[in-house]
Amino acid sequence: MNLTYNQFEILVAIEQRQNEKLTQRTLAKQTYVSLGIVNKVMEELSDLELITLKNNSTYELTLKGYEWLEPHRVKRAIFIAAGFGSRLVPITLNTPKPLIRVHGKLIIETLLDAVIDAGIKDITIVRGYLADQFDVLLKKYPMIKFITNPIYNESNNISSLMQVKDNLENAYVLESDLLLSNPRIIRKYEYTSNYLGIKMDVTDDWCFTLKKGIISKMSVGGENVFQMVGISYWNKEDGKKLATHIEKVFKKPGGKECYWDEVACKDYISDYKVMVRQCDKEDIVEIDTFNELKQIDKVYDI
């Protein structure tokens, strides 16, 4: 029951599009591999009896296909939503950034809807600034659990991860202020620990350098890198390690000022093999400033 990475990615892509006519070109675009690899892997999946062709280029997973994916199921989602969002003043003076409406929908809703559509029911939101306002989400999402970060305003986001450090196995960790346009990037299954990233020739933002597909460096700015997107997944083994490592970093001098992402991708990078899962810049947007918000939703341009 051991799938290669390419077999897994194409199997998941087919599972997401089972009722659609599906060309190999579509699969190549979604999985960021060549047509030749898609053709080869499709033959392998067919030979393994993991997929079957229904008609008119419509594929579906067999029972065996689902059984092979099951060990990779995502079990929970952790939302980090405690911060103030100072760069979006004045609107964040009265509203937490994840609860800002864009085109009539709360930013965090774009993520929550995708998580729920992926069958993930164990959902925790770590809140802090104007915490009670998040209760509005319970009407639509009664399954949500809230944890309050009491020191959000005197520490960096590692303090939010301290609140949930024992719940990171088989878990997505999501920044809650990302406006999601492509819900398919939130999936029922993940192959191994990974960060979402956008391939860039050059960026001045947080980014990853890769070595043989594994994150070898995390930095601010770089060339031929993947710009970091604030959605990651942690498998069972890495989730356990993170619980220990987050606490160690948090308790060291100056540890409260750290970004939690630095724990696995900088401080203890040799203990992890974290991949980058590629996405496009059109898939997801972080609205950093009030001017950017006005450009995206003209209702604020007054």
Model features per residue range: what roles?
Residues 46-56:
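A short, conserved structural fragment
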Residues 66-77, 228-302:
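Conserved alpha/beta core of the MobA/IspD/sugar-nucleotide pyrophosphorylase nucleotidyltransferase superfamily
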Residues 182-254:
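Conserved core of the sugar-phosphate nucleotidyltransferase
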Residues 2-22:
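Short amphipathic alpha-helical interface segments
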Residues 3-6, 23, 55-72:
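Short, cationic-aromatic polyanion-contact patches
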Residues 135-206:
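Conserved beta-loop-beta/alpha segment of the NTase-like Rossmann-fold superfamily
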Residues 14, 71-131:
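N-terminal glycine-rich phosphate-binding loop and ensuing alpha1 helix
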Residues 32-44:
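Short amphipathic alpha-helical interaction segments
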